[in-house]
Amino acid sequence: MKHKVSKRVISLKWVPFLCISFFALGAIFTSRSWEPSSDSGSQLISQHHRDHELQIVSDDCAHNKKATQEKDVTGEVLRTHEAIQDDRSLDKSVSTLSSTRSSQEMVDGSETNPRKKVFMVMGINTAFSSRKRRDSVRETWMPQGEKLERLEQEKGIVIKFMIGHSATSNSILDRAIDSEDAQHKDFLRLEHVEGYHELSAKTKIFFSTAVAKWDAEFYIKVDDDVHVNLGMLASTLARHRSKPRVYIGCMKSGPVLAQNLLNCFRTVKYHEPEYWKFGEDGNKYFRHATGQIYAISKDLANYISINQPILHKYANEDVSLGSWFIGLEVEHIDDRNFCCGTPPDCRWKAEAGDVCVASFEWSCSGICKSVERMKIVHEVCSEGEGAVWNTLL
């Protein structure tokens, strides 16, 4: 019993000590327990600072990126503006070059010899071998010398034999033409190599050359084996001068000749190598003026001059000319006085008061044996020498 009491007393003595010990241990434990929390708080604060700094850096990057983009856009605008300025400079340069070229052309002759305004320019198609044909024309319906000059000055009618040059520079053929021109002063020299199969090219070059030299209301092409009444031609054209685009002549539409050989010894004169472009065999050409003589107004001559490099040439010159006007607003005028026959046809018409513009024979595509017969045709079919001078233009 005594033993039990003693044991209880010892226990009571140790209670305060144990309490203090537990309190101390609790304090120590509590202090250690909050240290990590303090570290966590510091980490949270540090993390917050880092996030804030990252946000600032990010904002700075975004700002810099935006600034860079704005700078890039500004740069693009500046470069575009500079490019536009360059384009304007280029346009200005082209304009300057054009002006310089125009000025040079004026210096070369346009200023001192500007295009003369005339009523009509007639080009008589001729060849090196056709001296006698030219003389037969000069002796009949074409005025010579002072009369030819006066016709141009008073009536605005220009008449020239048109011819190119030979394949060999300064050949005997070219020198012969030089000599003939020095005598008669009635040639228009073309930058063209003469050849029968190059008539389409020659026609283009004639119109281009004539347009560059004369500002005419009408341009006419005629062959050197055709008889022409100049007064009737001028008065006929004058009736159409108010129309902007006219194509005047004897309109026809012949068959497209696909075969090149008649037999083993003869070829077809008017064979068309590009016959397939006109459709099936047996088709006809589109309507066009026969090539012996035709007239076109100023706008059409200018059109040929401007587009000369890209105008297609067919085998036949008159077909080529007609093809150049396909698709254009052109008035085709079929005037049968442009294709009268030789006597007695032209005489009958003259007696009836319907003087012919031109006379020739279809079988020869001109006046047959024109060198010998031009005078005969002129005596019978001529309108009279004074007709052209009395024509009101």
Curated annotation (Swiss-Prot):
A Gene Ontology MF term for this entry? beta-1,3-galactosyltransferase activity
Enzymatic class: transferase
- Membrane-spanning intervals of the chain: 9-29
Name one process (GO BP) from the record: protein glycosylation
Cofactor(s) needed by this chain? Mn(2+)
Give membrane topology per the record. Answer: Single-pass type II membrane protein
Q: In which tissues is it expressed?
A: Expressed in leaves, stems, flowers and siliques.
Quote the subcellular location field of this record: Golgi apparatus membrane
Q: In which pathway does it act?
A: Protein modification; protein glycosylation
Question: Which intervals of the chain are annotated as region Disordered?
Answer: 89-112
Which residues fall in a compositionally biased region of kind Low complexity?
93-103
Described function: Beta-1,3-galactosyltransferase that transfers galactose from UDP-galactose to substrates with a terminal glycosyl residue.
- What is the protein's name according to its record? Beta-1,3-galactosyltransferase 7
State the organism named in the record. Arabidopsis thaliana
- Which gene underlies this protein? B3GALT7
